[in-house]
Amino acid sequence: MTNAAGSSSALQNRFRTHYCGSLGPVLQQEKVSLAGWVHRIRDHGGLVFIDLRDHTGICQLVIQPEEKELFEQASHLHAESVIAIEGSVVLRSPETVNARLASGAIEVVVSALTVESNARPLPFPVADELPTSEELRLKYRFIDLRREKIHENIIFRSRVSSAIRRYLEERDFVEIQTPILTSSSPEGARDFLVPSRLHPGKFYALPQAPQQFKQLLMVAGFPRYFQIAPCFRDEDARADRSPGEFYQLDMEMAFIEQDDLFEILEGMFRHLVTSMSKKRITAFPFPRISYRDVMNRFGTDKPDLRIPLEIADVTPLFVNSGFKVFAANTKEGCAVKALVLKGRGTESRLFYDKAEKRAKELGSAGLAYIQFREEGLKGPIVKFMSEGEIASMKEQLSLETGDVVFFAAGKWEAACRIMGGMRTYFGELFTLDHDELSFCWIVDFPMYEYNEEAGKIDFSHNPFSMPQGEMEALETMDPLELLAYQYDIVCNGIELSSGAIRNHRPDIMYRAFEIAGYSKEDVDLRFGHMIEAFKLGAPPHGGIAPGLDRLVMILRDEQNIREVIAFPMNQQAEDLMMSAPSEVTTAQLRELHIKLDLPKED
């Protein structure tokens, strides 16, 4: 458990004068009062030892055999019973010192014991932390939270939140709470709807994010806003995403440019990493990589920069190639991407079969490769390649004997993503340093993309981002060449947040939406309150909202987001402990003017 401060007047009451984790040799012969949970209890031939646990740690209690009444009380105790004791601190003999405990040099000889609550047998042990099903852990989460690792995770999360608040307040940010009941926004993920009793047939929505409120705060004259905000989205669970509810550090700043926000966030992350963990940041300031560049080099806009592999574009090599499949692709405007694995050219056939299976899972028709072996070239496309093509390839990719190069072809983005998926797959061959945090910014996202299914131009990402070049760019450039002031922050392949410099100009907003096929009336109908606010004096502004849950996951080396949330739902968006969601009474539904139309059971 995490150590806390020692005795203080604030904690001196009838239950305790000290915390378990604060006891040490300096308190020898002092009388103390302690309270907590029975972690373990052992009878050693007349001596009873109790490991007492509170939120700061564990200390050992001793009940002497001559203390008949205490001995009798202890004989009826179960693990996780709650007790309060009085006793004297004594030094342990040298051979019994427990170096694993902060209080391991002492023990407390008990003179009085009160059983506040005797626990019945537990559904799973706390002390031994044996493997336990997630269903059982979530049903009895209050017991699971007593376990050392998850207990420390929750305390650590609290400290991260406090450190964030201090850091931002020192830089003139103001913490402001925004509404939990708001209007529905069907353009995003599915909303959680809340029926209104006072307005029959109408619904509130729980906010997916405080996006519009924080922008309105900029209009209201609060130039630096933040809150650790609850957000609600009716979406499926993943290992790094909790269904239903999550928390984000919501931030917005007025009169800034992109680099101003980067400086604030980079400084905050560096402060958190250096002050709260043993991890280290690879590069500071964080590298900036354009969307086009990150896709070409890593095949994803969420790259794990610890993986020592980069993708190469070899399209020109195949324009007139004897390998007709790739040559035909290049003539259709497609790209050919390559990935080199140094020293892996002699792997077994099983290695290549597994790699091809993964490539097909990523959407590729197959996986072409060439092995550069001592005895010559091997691979499914070698026979189609001329000596000149091989020589050019070796020169461009710095290939040597013992290497292997893999290829993927297709439309630019598809080829990039297939090879990016293979880069991540092959990344498992390397031992990545879990104490290294490789942050980067992804910038210069495209403003628009072509929706082939709809046959029209759509917004690529956030429609409220300011286009680079503003109105002039919208009027003069090919929409598919336009870039937005939008950015993502990524760490070790995990996207922590997206953000943007906002479009605060109604004239630019109308034109940006017009290019995507929206009329002025459409924009006013959907976003009229924002447009109206911007017409009444809106400063340039931008923001970001890193996920608190994911940040704590990274700092604590957790693979599952439920390990850093006190009361998470399961994968099916159920709270097993509170039995939510649950049915409600007919009277409750009638009061809300709701009639159920449930799907028929199979």
Curated annotation (Swiss-Prot):
Gene3D superfamilies: Bira Bifunctional Protein, Domain 2 (3.30.930.10), GAD-like domain (3.30.1360.30), Nucleic acid-binding proteins (2.40.50.140). Coiled coil: none annotated. It is found in: Cytoplasm. Residues 211-214 are annotated as: Aspartate. One of its GO terms (molecular function) is ATP binding. The record marks H44 as: Important for tRNA non-discrimination. This is Aspartate--tRNA(Asp/Asn) ligase. GO terms for biological process: aspartyl-tRNA aminoacylation. GO terms for cellular component: cytoplasm. It catalyses: tRNA(Asx) + L-aspartate + ATP = L-aspartyl-tRNA(Asx) + AMP + diphosphate. It comes from Chlorobium phaeovibrioides (strain DSM 265 / 1930) (Prosthecochloris vibrioformis (strain DSM 265)). HAMAP family: Asp_tRNA_synth_type1. Its main location: cytoplasm. The keyword Aminoacyl-tRNA synthetase applies. InterPro entries: Aa-tRNA-synt_II, aa-tRNA-synth_II, aa-tRNA-synth_II/BPL/LPL, Asp-tRNA-ligase_1, Asp-tRNA-ligase_1_N, Asp/Asn-tRNA-synth_IIb, AspRS_core, GAD-like_sf. It comes from the Bacteria. ATP binds at R233, D234, E235, E495, G547, L548, D549, R550. Its EC number is 6.1.1.23. Signal peptide: none annotated. L-aspartate binds at E187, R233, H461, R502. Aspartyl-tRNA synthetase with relaxed tRNA specificity since it is able to aspartylate not only its cognate tRNA(Asp) but also tRNA(Asn). Reaction proceeds in two steps: L-aspartate is first activated by ATP to form Asp-AMP and then transferred to the acceptor end of tRNA(Asp/Asn). PANTHER family: ASPARTATE--TRNA LIGASE, MITOCHONDRIAL, ASPARTYL/LYSYL-TRNA SYNTHETASE. It holds the Pfam family tRNA-synt_2. The keyword Membrane does not apply. Belongs to the class-II aminoacyl-tRNA synthetase family. Type 1 subfamily. Homodimer. Keywords: Aminoacyl-tRNA synthetase, ATP-binding, Cytoplasm, Ligase, Nucleotide-binding, Protein biosynthesis.
